[in-house]
């Protein structure tokens, strides 16, 4: 649980996620502002259905990605690598996520793009502020944490 708490605290301070999807051997990545839900261990993003990455995702798809800062020194590198599943939200689930997203990013009220959830199943958090190459790993299904 301590690993997930540390990861969640760091993710709550960031705001841009990069995620990648593949379809028929073709890969594509995209960036978006995100809202992180520590209880569900999921990102919520907005993206138009007409985008290449949304078209490749369809209603749901496997996904991998990163969240990282831009430190000027190696000793301060912190970042997350993850894999999971992306899906477009519908109905009440979408409405609730959009309200929370709009609280974090008020400018999003002007956007009509659908809400998507990236459910994280595996997270690797690198935190060089704890020592060079320090890694923490969290896995959803097994509840496993490695520090």
Curated annotation (Swiss-Prot):
GO cellular component annotations of the record: cytosol
Superkingdom of this protein's organism: Bacteria
Family under the similarity heading: Belongs to the UPF0306 family.
Entry protein name: UPF0306 protein YhbP
The organism's taxonomic lineage, starting at the top: Bacteria, Pseudomonadati, Pseudomonadota, Gammaproteobacteria, Enterobacterales
